[in-house]
């Protein structure tokens, strides 16, 4: 139980931030999933378009502090390699 006003405020703030960050992560996962489904379908143009849309979302995740930059770099690299290999 939070005993100080500051601790109570931090709890409220953390709940709000957790919801916002969860929404951001969900949005990023959706964009990555679009690339994955296009890759599974074997459609190179759709996969390239989906990747083009996903890259700024991933970068935004880094800027907002939702994802680590190395995680995003790894994901982008792997997706780009898979799209190029189609």
Curated annotation (Swiss-Prot):
Protein family according to the UniProt entry: Belongs to the bacterial ribosomal protein bS20 family.
GO CC terms, sorted: small ribosomal subunit
Record-level Gene Ontology MF annotations: small ribosomal subunit rRNA binding; structural constituent of ribosome
Originating organism: Novosphingobium aromaticivorans (strain ATCC 700278 / DSM 12444 / CCUG 56034 / CIP 105152 / NBRC 16084 / F199)
Protein name, entry field: Small ribosomal subunit protein bS20
Entry's Gene Ontology BP terms: translation
Chain's gene name: rpsT
InterPro entries to which the protein is assigned, alphabetical: Ribosomal_bS20, Ribosomal_bS20_sf
UniProt function note: Binds directly to 16S ribosomal RNA.
SUPFAM superfamilies in alphabetical order: Ribosomal protein S20 (SSF46992)
Protein keywords: Ribonucleoprotein, Ribosomal protein, RNA-binding, rRNA-binding
């Amino acid at each position: 139980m939070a005993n100080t006003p500051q601790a109570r405020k931090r709890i409220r703030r953390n709940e709000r931030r957790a919801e916002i960050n969860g929404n951001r992560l969900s949005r990023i996962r959706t964009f990555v999933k679009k690339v994955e489904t296009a890759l599974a379908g074997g459609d190179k143009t759709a996969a390239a378009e989906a990747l083009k849309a996903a890259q700024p979302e991933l970068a935004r995740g880094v800027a907002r502090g939702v994802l680590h930059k190395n995680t995003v770099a790894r994901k982008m690299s792997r997706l780009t390699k898979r799209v190029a290999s189609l």
